[in-house]
A protein has these predicted regions:
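Extracellular/periplasmic, surface-exposed regions of secreted and cell-surface proteins
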Residues: 1-209
């Protein structure tokens, strides 16, 4: 018997405007409330006393009962903003803060942002005639992640003996911190001789801890 569900509640606000100086803005901000629940109850026996009678009481062995209960809550606030100036300069900014029930109280809140910029250099500066396009770009981004439920402190498990429980033998890290992946990217796009020759270059570095 398995009962598994996820409930999400979202709110989102958006803003868009264009200004006379050539600046275009798109922005949004919102939040999410997520709840997960997993309940599993299973029982099995080895062999049947009476063939064809599939009941726990008809097992040759004692019933092996397994119960798994997992619950998780994750609340989030986030924003994103995109700026474009005369289709020459571009800036994208995002940010998100999560509060996870699977982490210790002292580390339950974690924030991860991102910033990316790009510029069409041939629209900003005078370039040699063979160059049709020169666009440079760079970005910084972080992504956060929590863990599964009940990974930070010991808990009682079920036992085959009725009315009893098992003490966990694992030593848990009670200062468990969220996983943060940080990546950097830089590069450029070059098109020359009426787009007959092109070059794309990207440098990428990622670190997770």
């Amino acid at each position: 018997n398995v009962f598994d569900y996820e409930l999400n509640s979202d709110a989102l606000f958006t803003y868009h405007d264009s200004f006379a100086n050539g600046l275009h803005v798109n922005a949004s901000a919102g939040g999410n409330m997520m709840q997960q629940s997993y309940d599993m109850l299973a029982a099995s026996v080895v062999g049947l006393i009476t063939p064809g009678v599939y009941k726990l009481a008809n097992g040759v062995s004692n019933p092996n009962v397994q119960t798994v209960i997992k619950k998780k809550a994750l609340n989030s606030l986030y924003f994103t903003a995109n700026f474009a100036y005369k289709d020459k300069l571009f800036l994208d900014v995002t940010g998100r803060n999560d509060w996870s029930s699977t982490l210790p109280k002292s580390n339950r809140s974690f924030f991860y942002p991102s910033v990316s910029v790009s510029a069409v250099m041939n629209e900003l500066f005078l370039m040699p005639e063979p160059i049709n396009l020169l666009k440079v770009r760079g970005s910084f981004a972080q992504v956060g992640n929590d863990t599964d439920p009940y990974k930070t402190s010991p808990y009682y498990g079920t036992s085959d003996f009725p009315g009893s429980a098992v003490v966990a033998s694992t030593l848990y890290n009670q200062d468990f911190k969220p996983e943060i992946s940080t990546n950097y990217e830089a590069g450029f796009d070059l098109r020359m001789f009426q787009n007959r020759i092109g070059l794309d270059f990207t440098f990428y570095y990622n670190r997770t801890k």
